[in-house]
Swiss-Prot record:
Any GO BP: bacterial-type flagellum-dependent cell motility
Primary location: other
Gene Ontology annotations for the cellular component aspect, listed alphabetically: bacterial-type flagellum basal body
Entry-linked InterPro entries: FliE (IPR001624)
Protein's name in the database: Flagellar hook-basal body complex protein FliE
Keywords: Bacterial flagellum
Lineage: Bacteria, Pseudomonadati, Campylobacterota, Epsilonproteobacteria, Campylobacterales
GO molecular function terms listed in the Swiss-Prot or TrEMBL record: cytoskeletal motor activity; structural molecule activity
Localization (cell): Bacterial flagellum basal body
Annotated segments matching region Disordered: 1-38
HAMAP family xref list: FliE (MF_00724)
Amino acid sequence: MQAIHNDKSLLSPFSELNTDNRTKREESGSTFKEQKGGEFSKLLKQSINELNNTQEQSDKALADMATGQIKDLHQAAIAIGKAETSMKLMLEVRNKAISAYKELLRTQI
């Protein structure tokens, strides 16, 4: 038994798990998290801008329908349906984000 405890060659595969390597991984992980946080923010802003554009197209289609300037009624209906679906999706994303935030607040440390 003592030979096993004193033989450091048996521990060589585990020597890579020392604190220096762990610190490097943690540092790179924090950088990764910061980058991903920025990416999420960009994605969210992009999605909101796309939703806004879709809503504007829908409003224009409705105005054109009301004034009789629209030539293709089907395209207007598609634009309105697309805007409605996009809004529902964004509301669900918002609801899930709020739910996740509330769950984090309830988490005890």
